[in-house]
């Protein structure tokens, strides 16, 4: 599946995207604000994508979309739309390499995912989680029109900041 905006193309993740995801998953900001995947090589990342991410999380129009900058045709980030066990609504997420930050790409990609969620998947609400200390992500969600709901435990006993957007 492919989604696009004026400046970006969002393609469903593939195992051959492993070099990009290895770089993203090992970015210090990704580790600090999202999760440490503890992947030590491109080969480990390829296996992770092939065995865990793609088969478990990418189906029924949901999953991880590699975000490409159209002008240079290079991957700069990821946007996701997931169904989580402890929630009733789809969860939008994003992460960008330093090369893709500060240019409005996260806003543009997330807005694209939101439009897809409403128009194609026919959802009336979408949610997003972010770590409480991730101020940049909170600002982005607020700019997109999300409302802060409070803290909610989503996994591993940690409470994340929950935001919602009603279409």
For each feature predicted by the language model, list its residue ranges.
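A short helix-loop-beta-strand connector motif used in the catalytic cores of GNAT acetyltransferases and
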Residues: 53-66
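Hydrophobic residues in alpha-helical segments
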Residues: 25, 34, 56-58
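Conserved GNAT-fold acetyl-CoA-binding loop/helix
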Residues: 29-51
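Acyl-donor (CoA/ACP) binding surface of acyl/acetyltransferases
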Residues: 1-32, 66-167
């Amino acid at each position: 599946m492919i989604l696009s905006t004026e400046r970006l193309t969002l393609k469903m993740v593939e195992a051959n995207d492993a070099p990009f995801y290895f770089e993203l998953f090992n970015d210090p900001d990704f580790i600090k604000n999202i999760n440490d995947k503890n992947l030590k090589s491109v080969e480990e990342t390829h296996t992770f994508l092939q065995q865990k991410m793609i088969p478990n999380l990418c189906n029924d129009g949901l999953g991880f979309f590699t975000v490409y900058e159209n002008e240079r045709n290079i991957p700069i980030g990821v946007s996701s739309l997931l169904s989580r066990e402890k929630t009733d609504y789809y969860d939008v997420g994003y992460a960008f390499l330093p090369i893709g930050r500060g240019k409005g790409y996260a806003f543009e990609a997330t807005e694209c995912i939101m439009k897809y969620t409403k128009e194609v998947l026919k959802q009336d609400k979408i949610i997003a989680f972010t770590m409480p200390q991730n101020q940049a992500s909170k600002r982005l969600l607020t700019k997109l029109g999300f409302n802060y709901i409070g803290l909610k435990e989503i996994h591993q006993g940690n409470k994340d900041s929950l935001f919602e957007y009603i279409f």
